[in-house]
Amino acid sequence: MITRRGVLAGGISAAASAAYGQAPLSSLVPMPRPTAPTPAGAAGLENLIAASPYQGAVAAVVADARTGEILQGHNASANLPPASTMKVLTTLYALDALGAGYRFATRVLATGNLRNGRLEGDLWLYGEGDPHLDTTGLAMLVTGLRDIGLREVTGALHLVDTSLPSIPLIDATQADYAGYNPAISGLNLNFNRVYLAWEQGTNGLQVGLDARADDLRPAVLGIGLTVADRAAPILDYRAETATAREGWSVARSALTGEGGRWLPVRNTAAYVGEVFASLARSSGIVLSRVQRATAVPSEAVVLSEISSTPLDGMLRSMLRYSTNLTAEVVGLRATQTLTGAANPSLRQSADHMAARLDGRYVSGRAELHDHSGLQDLSQMTPVQMVQALVAAGPRGRLRNLLRAHRVNDEVQAQIGTAEIVTKTGTLNFVSTLTGYIEGPNRPLAFAIFNADLPRRAALGPEERDRPPGGRTWIGRARTLQNDMLVSWLRGFG
């Protein structure tokens, strides 16, 4: 049951685009009053949309953030992809399940006997899925081993990544080289990306892969890399089924001057193991073998351990930088905690999140396929998004995690001193915006979904990086969104 007053009710009629008074979201059937005049200063949404060069679907709603009273809407019950505004729902889901202080641990454990710096036994690297673990974090674990005097391991380093299901990617429709479409595992490193760097040296082109973080640059040799004399494709990914070894081929024509880019890693355990072993060797610790394992023996003893930042800080970073890996990891961990399921798929986990939110934060079960919003199969209504914002409250923990809305000087002059905090979402021909407006009179909660799904579906694989007309379309969508914010602030805030 949702207890926050004014929350929940069905949507607004798709045709209701003029401003009107309406019963709060908590009523079973919204009762629009189309004859209510548009408040002074607020423009009718139909007029704003008609005056805009933007082309595509628009679904938008604004409500009183304290009572849930819907103040204005347009196609507000239309189901469209929320894109990365989905992370607002994931934030609420994870905080409810795990708590703001939850931390992910990464441990190095040992079985056997440690004598005079020599471990006659095995090491076990166990991860709880920390999405922020980077090479610096691994180096801290190695330092912990060195500080207790470890110098040699006679057995193997076992990699245990089974605390989360191993998922090779979030969205199968994305390009192989999309760094925002990473693998998910119980052992994640550098957001499951490896850095491709190149420069023109005295002996010609120098190219390589590394796991850089801060001032560390451990080379990564376990992922194949070749340079090919071709014009296209610039990047080509291959994975060997038998060995799970992955590799990249790069077009020489693209490697001009000095540069670099992050590439996704699919076999995350092998990547983590190689980097950890490299750091250990650099610290004088001899490791002979690295292999995967499914569990840590019960008799293993912790030798070194690090913990992630608390969940609320992790979520603040996720909402600011829209990190998909963080969203999927915290969503999966929340589902594991609530259901006891050890290996839910992304679809199963997202579906459980939708069921959990229904009746607590939203009215009706949204169609969710992930926790990040990367898949356009995930769809919901802007009314549902606003319901979640109202339920969370304009002074609640979600409000404090969202970032200030960034606008140009012209829009800022119209907003004045009002505070607007938002989460944005962007896919090809999808642009979404949701958040709170803190005006002089009352706080508002809003959601705006813009999409041209037929145009998105028509893109060929070679067009997805730079879709024809995509930049212009996004610019027009964002201008329309800002026009709505200014209108709502003037009329209702």
Model-found features: residue ranges?
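N-terminal export signals
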Residues: 1-24
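A short, well-structured edge-of-sheet supersecondary motif
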Residues: 50-74, 292
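Small-residue-rich helix-loop
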Residues: 336-450, 455-492
